[in-house]
Amino acid sequence: RSQTVTGVQTCALPIFWSEAGPRSFWMKDTTIPLSIAFMDRRGRILNIERMAPLRQDRFHRSQGLARYALEMNQGWFARHGVEPGDRARFRLPGGPATHPAPEKGHSR
């Protein structure tokens, strides 16, 4: 299944999957440079990939099993000091902050 961001100049796209798994993205038909952070089921950033626009020949893959991803304008993560190993919290519209589930056998 292909997912793309087209026709926009800025980007902040959260992506959620029901299960953690290996993930990959490409930049076909996407005209702005993006960065993507792949996160595990606990919200820990596995890796951040810089993605060049309109590239159909390069896939950007998670370095581990990803449950979440966040696409931002390229360089956003670096400018804000976000790096692999950091953890994210999410706030869904109209709801409280969501903390990704801890690993089995671990408490918060």
Place the predicted regions along the sequence by residue:
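Short connector loops at helix/strand junctions that flank enzyme active sites
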Residues: V8-T10, D29-P33, D40, Q63-R67
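Core catalytic alpha/beta fold that binds nucleotide/phospho-ligands
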Residues: Q9, G21-R23, T30, P84, ...
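Mid-length scaffold segments of soluble, non-membrane domains
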Residues: I15-I48
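Well-ordered alpha/beta subsegment
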Residues: P53-H106
